[in-house]
Curated annotation (Swiss-Prot):
EC number of this enzyme: 3.4.19.12
Organism lineage: Eukaryota, Viridiplantae, Streptophyta, Embryophyta, Tracheophyta
Keywords from the named record: Hydrolase, Protease, Thiol protease, Ubl conjugation pathway
Enzyme's top EC category: hydrolase
Gene3D superfamilies documented for this protein: Cysteine proteinases
Entry-linked PANTHER family: UBIQUITIN CARBOXYL-TERMINAL HYDROLASE, UBIQUITIN CARBOXYL-TERMINAL HYDROLASE 23
Protein's UniProt keywords contain Protease: yes
Family annotation (SUPFAM superfamilies): Cysteine proteinases
Protein name: Ubiquitin carboxyl-terminal hydrolase 23
Compositionally biased intervals (Polar residues): 1-24
Disordered as annotated region, ranges: 1-26, 722-749, 822-859
Active site (UniProt): 116, 369
Family in the record: Belongs to the peptidase C19 family.
Role description: Recognizes and hydrolyzes the peptide bond at the C-terminal Gly of ubiquitin. Involved in the processing of poly-ubiquitin precursors as well as that of ubiquitinated proteins.
Amino acid sequence: MEVATSSTEITIQTDRDPSSNNNGSCAVASSTASAVFRKIEFHPARKPFNGFSNGRSDFKIETLNPCSSNQRLLSAPSAKKPDSSDLLEHGFEPDLTFSITFRKIGAGLQNLGNTCFLNSVLQCLTYTEPLAATLQTAAHQKYCHVAGFCALCAIQKHVRTARQANGRILAPKDLVSNLRCISRNFRNCRQEDAHEYMINLLECMHKCSLPSGVPSESSDAYRRSLVHKIFGGSLRSQVKCEQCSHCSNKFDPFLDLSLDISKADSLQRALSRFTAVELLDNGAKVYQCERCKQKVKAKKQLTVSKAPYVLTVHLKRFEAHRSEKIDRKVDFTSAIDMKPFVSGPHEGNLKYTLYGVLVHYGRSSHSGHYACFVRTSSGMWYSLDDNRVVQVSEKTVFNQKAYMLFYVRDRQNAVPKNSVPVVKKESFATNRASLIVASNIKDQVNGSTVIKECGFGALVANGLAPLKSCGPSTPAVLTQKDLNAKETQNNAISNVEAKEILETENGSAPVKTCDLAAPTVLVQKDLNTKEIFQKEVPLPQANGEGSLVKEDSKAACLILPEKVSPHLDGSANAQTLVKLPTLGPKAENSVEEKNSLNNLNEPANSLKVINVSVGNPPVEKAVLIDQTMGHHLEESATSIESLKLTSERETLTTPKKTRKPKTKTLKVEFKFFKLALGLRKKKVQRRERLSTTVAGEIISEELLSKKRVKYQDTSLIAPSKMISSSDGAVTSDQQQPVGSSDLSEASQNAKRKRESVLLQKEAVNILTRGVPETVVAKWDEEISASQKRGSKSEGASSIGYVADEWDEEYDRGKKKKIRIKEESYRGPNPFQMLASKRQKETKKKWTQSITDAKTAYRI
């Protein structure tokens, strides 16, 4: 095989050996055609690559060299892990090669009593992508040796739970109850400093991540610690003698940079003041020089020797002997370059991107409230104020008076020498590419065919149904249009062409040849003569792992819709449903042609259903032609009793949910073809898995969109019924309306309108008449049936429940309720009658006395 490459195209010459095909099921070309030429042109992707989604986790592939080719391949490259020396050369640890993405905001945190400082710090740590990715993959809980409370296990558990709890509220009880395990200075239900809590929490996590027996402040501990790999850096304190220029360097690890903002109005200015050169003791001779052996004047400078992976900046908003907070605005930007402030050797860039802002509200340094703002991987900012999670604009974030800033180091320009994206294997089980050569005129350049790739997780443009990848013994599907030949062809398909799949294996060229045992299904359409030419080759028994149909399935259904560019004459949709059998003694080639006068007068839209059987069942076919004006239905001369569209669950399905067109079981018979003329295009409903009975119902969308309004009322849908048997065959014992989605949809719309009118009436009744009263029985009576009916008939809406009467004596503890056995009496209660009579007499006397008192007497 010879490969000739250029900047934009690849030409492949493949030599075929007819004797290499042992199955003998594929048609082989003549001996003269010994070489087949391929020409593949690559075009840049139109949409940005967002990475692969792997089930519930959010791992993705990050492109470290965006300047290279924009071509993205769905196939898995060789899983070669980057060399550790290459990563260390650019300042990255080998353990931090993977990152995690937060496309959606997680859960809010409940305030358990002055725990806003804890909630804000936890949210900022949760959305620190390097920390979350490491905690997601690390198996620390299995090998944890800490007796009692482990801060690293608690953070790992919290991060995993918070990422999956979208729209919920979590209570960090484990961290709040063990607050004194973080530091002895903390007390429950007391306001604490967020920066102090974060530093103590990271130190506790640092100790828990070390193996047993390793001191926490040793150089080996800083090198092994997970916390210092992410947040840790090194500061260089340099003292320079004024006389001999001798320099004394001291290196100290740090987890954050505390900057003085008393004389700085921006983050850049604060960093410049932090790394500025200053005189020791205002120029006094207090420094003992090692070379001069005397006390001399000296200068001191602090610089960053080793830049951390995650830079945490603490802005000092307090001063000694001052209770008020420094409430000045310090400007900060979304990106910062630390190169001017780093003195040590470094490779690559030192640019950081802002992802978290922690804010303190209040004028005093002893009290107040904490909240934070975090940025997700999609670039959206969210305000996390305890359990309140709100999306905000970037301008709102930069207007805050920040207390702590969180930056993450960019990895775009740090390119390892032999870097390849490492992908987990299970992510490719459902994202294999299927070879579909699109027949659009726009995609053909200089007569060459552009090979597109489509994943199983998304619908392909132009209405093509996604199929599984071209694996061993898997058919390759080709669709071509605008052929110039006007006569029908009876030649059998030659060697299986177009078996390339866009897949890279072991770093080779991104072209892979399928198994020779896989057939080709080719559909061509001549637009000039409006003739339909079809070639079909039965599919042999497929035993490959990536095959379209497995051994236990009965048949495979391929839907090959064709869509022509709108500027072509006679352009329309021609859709073909082909049933490919997989079981049988031997596959036979069958070429179906149709060249009659009826086909010449075909309208723009046509539906063809072809059943290619192997073995005992005969060959059955049926054609549904939708006339443009009169909606006439032409039926084929061959009588068809049924068309079996049976397949197992694994046929054209994947373990995870994918967008697939909804299909229904179609009874292919003359009287059942009178359907789908007035159907409207349905909206995308909830995605569901295919049932055991796979069916194909292909609807011409362009014709329906034109005639949707015209033929909505006068539909020519013929009612029909069908019943699916247990083995998947379709019987016609009873008749059931098929394709009556217009009627069902209209009835649903009418039902929704009636319900909306009732709801509006109920709302008006509640607003005008008030909430309907509820009749409560007396202490020894029951509600009569008329009263019950009357209370219910006044209004359909109700408050939902009736509260118990308020018993003040019971609430005060002076009275104890005793359950009394309920007894029902048929007649009236004589005691109640007597009490009512006395009450009426008393009321009558009372009203009479009031009336007499108001009467004026003349003196």
